[in-house]
Amino acid sequence: MPGVYLDDNEYNFDIALRRFKKQVEKAGVLSEMKKRQHFEKPSVMRKKKKAAARKRLLKKMRKANMG
C-alpha cells in the first residue's frame, strides 16, 4: 500500500499529496479498483485479453508497414 512520510522540515501538504498520487498511480491501485468494481466472468476476461492482443498485433503491423 502506497504511503508518504513527511520529513520534520516538510510541512507542505500539496507536495506530499502529489507524491502520494504518483505512488498510487505507479502501483496501479485505481486501475485495479476499477477492474474489480464489478465481477467479470473468466470467459469475458479471456475474450478481452485476446481482443487486446489482436489489437496490439494489428497496430504493430500497421506501424511496420508505414515506416
From Swiss-Prot:
GO cellular component: ribonucleoprotein complex; ribosome
UniProtKB keywords: Ribonucleoprotein, Ribosomal protein
GO molecular function: structural constituent of ribosome
Coiled-coil region: none
Entry-linked InterPro entries: Ribosomal_bS21 (IPR001911), Ribosomal_bS21_CS (IPR018278), Ribosomal_bS21_sf (IPR038380)
Single GO biological process annotation from the record: translation
One Pfam match: Ribosomal_S21
Keyword Ribosomal protein: yes
Record-stated family: Belongs to the bacterial ribosomal protein bS21 family.
HAMAP family in the cross-refs: Ribosomal_bS21
Protein name: Small ribosomal subunit protein bS21
